[in-house]
Amino acid sequence: MGYYDDDGNYHSFRRGVERAVDRITHPFHHHHHDHHDHHREEVIVTDERGPVRYRDGVKENVRIVEPRGAAATTSETVPIPTHFIRVGDILVLQGRPCQVIRISSSPMTDQRRYTGVDLFTRELHEESSFVSNPKPSVVVQTMLGPVYKTYRILDIQEGTIVALTESGDVKSGIPVIPQGNLYQRIKDAFLEGRGSVRALVINDGGRELVVDYKIIHSSRL
């Protein structure tokens, strides 16, 4: 048994499950494998633009969890195993979309607890992981991540984008999260014109925010 990836390549479950899950959980950072190293130093800085992570002196950008294919349902959230969650990821904490700035665990139960900054209000929220026992002696911990919308960027306008939604509507004035120089990177990619630039958008009761982007090259359009 196996699965087909986005490029139509077949992968065996026996050899590819862990790699596939890592790509799904961190779609824009699957080339990094150092997240299993629990001894790396992480420094979290929170300022007026939002939390920023520095790992080994390198500033890292917002990272998100994006469901793909059949997983991208109409649900507002998607479950994420806790062992794939890192500081800097976006989760739903207390019903709010937040960027994780702290992860702790109970010394007695090893249950994870996450602290994050609300992407829209900048308030702090905390929530513990959901623990289940699908089989005897098997413990699974999960958290909820938001389901993202993918919009095709049509134009760039002073810190916002004009985009074609999944339903075919045109929306203007969608703000870009002011972090990690994201707006400038989107602008550069759009002006280069090497492919169709897609914005990954999070929704909060009608308010929308661009939190990342990807480029779809002509061979995959």
UniProtKB/Swiss-Prot annotation:
Compartmental location: Cell septum
Motif (Microbody targeting signal): 219-221
GO cellular component, one term: cell septum
Disulfide bonds: none
GO terms of molecular function: ribosome binding; RNA binding; translation elongation factor activity
Subcellular location, principal: other
GO annotation (BP), single: translational elongation
Family assignment from sequence similarity: Belongs to the eIF-5A family. Hex1 subfamily.
General function of this protein: Major component of Woronin bodies, fungal-specific organelles that occlude septal pores in order to separate intact from damaged compartments. Hex1 binds directly or indirectly to the Woronin body tether that in turn is anchored at the rim of the septal pore.
Assembly description: Forms oligomers. Self-assembles into hexagonal rods.
Name this polypeptide is given: Woronin body major protein
